[in-house]
């Protein structure tokens, strides 16, 4: 449910936004959700809708970029823009504009390899970049480390629930993963709607297809199937609005 300026949003207000395509679907999903989404003003709501749409687009683009999957210890990147730490994090080089560094991953993906958690962070950053523009992005994010949630500056949080909305990050758990392939203990994905999920290293697949791939990477004698966890990982939109002054 959407609460706008302290009041439940009306159908007339929703219609006044005149959104189309996936943006309209996102708006209606927010309204139909059992979760409550509170906004001070209409521009905050439109910011979230646009951000989620851009996250979906970024996930599709990263899938086509040629970037490879790798465990953290084997991460690699375009050396002109990024330094790879011993832990496998991508650290933006001094005097490289953050927007340029993020865009290079999508433009020269074949030079990059990283874990699925890193891929989600990259998708989130690109979604924000496309939403706020280069100037604001570079002004507020003067240095970047791409690794997992612990290194983000976007106020990423995870909460329980299965009321999924386009652009959410979800997680497929593989409880009996092979110890020889511990990277397949699970898969972080971006929800693209209509049973489509982007998972780095797997591609854009249905839930059944992702579960099948994870099940093939279980340890011998495993009996428990992989499954989609009832949780969502999102960015704090109000925090982002304050951060970028949009």
From Swiss-Prot:
Q: Which InterPro entries match?
A: Gln_gamma-glutamylTfrase_bac (IPR020916)
Biological process per Gene Ontology, one example term: sporulation resulting in formation of a cellular spore
What Pfam families does the entry give?
A: TGL (PF20085)
At the top level, the lineage of the source is Bacteria
Instruction: Report which reactions are catalysed by this protein.
Output: L-glutaminyl-[protein] + L-lysyl-[protein] = [protein]-L-lysyl-N(6)-5-L-glutamyl-[protein] + NH4(+)
Keyword annotations from UniProtKB, A to Z: Acyltransferase, Sporulation, Transferase
Please give the Gene Ontology molecular function terms for this protein.
Answer: protein-glutamine gamma-glutamyltransferase activity
According to its UniProt record, the EC number is: 2.3.2.13
Similarity-based family: Belongs to the bacillus TGase family.
Enumerate the NCBIfam families for this protein. Answer: PRK03187.1 (NF002869)
Q: What does this protein do?
A: Probably plays a role in the assembly of the spore coat proteins by catalyzing epsilon-(gamma-glutamyl)lysine cross-links.
Q: What is this protein called?
A: Protein-glutamine gamma-glutamyltransferase
Gene name of the encoded protein: tgl
């Amino acid at each position: 449910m959407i609460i706008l300026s302290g009041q439940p949003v009306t159908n007339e207000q929703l219609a006044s936004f005149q959104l189309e395509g996936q943006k309209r679907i996102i708006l209606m999903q927010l309204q139909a959700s059992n979760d409550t989404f509170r906004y001070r003003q209409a521009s905050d709501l439109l910011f979230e809708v646009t951000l989620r749409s851009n996250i979906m687009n970024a996930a599709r683009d990263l899938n086509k970029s040629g970037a490879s999957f790798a465990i953290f210890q084997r991460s690699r990147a375009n050396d002109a823009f990024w330094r790879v730490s011993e832990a496998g994090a991508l650290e933006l080089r001094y005097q490289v504009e953050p927007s340029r560094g993020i865009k290079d991953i999508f433009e020269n993906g074949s030079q990059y390899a990283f874990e699925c958690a890193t891929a989600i962070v990259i998708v989130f950053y690109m979604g924000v970049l496309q939403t706020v523009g280069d100037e604001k992005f570079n002004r507020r994010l003067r240095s970047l480390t791409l690794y997992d949630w612990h290194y983000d500056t976007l106020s990423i949080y995870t909460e329980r629930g299965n009321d999924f909305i386009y652009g959410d990050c979800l997680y497929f758990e593989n409880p009996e993963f092979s110890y020889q392939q511990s990277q397949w203990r699970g898969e972080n994905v971006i929800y693209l709607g209509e049973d489509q999920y982007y998972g780095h290293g797997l591609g854009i697949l249905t839930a059944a297809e992702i579960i099948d791939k994870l099940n093939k990477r279980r340890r011998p004698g495993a009996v428990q199937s992989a499954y989609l966890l009832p949780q969502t990982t999102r960015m704090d939109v109000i925090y982002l609005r304050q951060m970028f002054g949009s």
